Amino acid sequence: MSLPIVERLKLELAEKQRELQQDLPARLEEARAHGDLRENAEYEAAKNRQGILRAQVAQLQTRIRELSVYTLAQIPRDRVSYGSRVTVEDADSGESIEYRLVFPEEVDASAGSISISSPIGQGLMNRTEGDEVTVQTPRGRKTYHVISVVTLHEQPEGQGGKSA
């Protein structure tokens, strides 16, 4: 079974392809009907949008190919990895912080998700409960104690998990 991010990217790709193949041709045809294309702002806007969409479609196709090699079965069940919810304690302040490790496309700081390629994300990868990790952040070195790890496999489907 593929990762949830792959399914979301495929939906986004389908939306962009629909706009590129159905909506934009109609907008371009309508703009052409207005006459001189050299001074036609509608036509220029549609052509610009077409270029942007083509680039986005290519980027999404590449990312889907890259991520499609991973399956849920490859995600560890016993340590921090993609999709894990990790509670850490800041060694300096004693503050408890929960992070969810995700791919860069899924980052939502307001929801507590961080990229697996961020300094903290990289430091937490493959850690288990009880581990101590020191990471270099833009604000300096930080040490965290891993309090709990809930892997992607242990989470309800609506909260990032999928049955494997």
Indicate residue ranges for each PLM-predicted region.
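N-terminal intrinsically disordered, low-complexity, charge/repeat-rich segments that act as generic
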Residues: 1-70
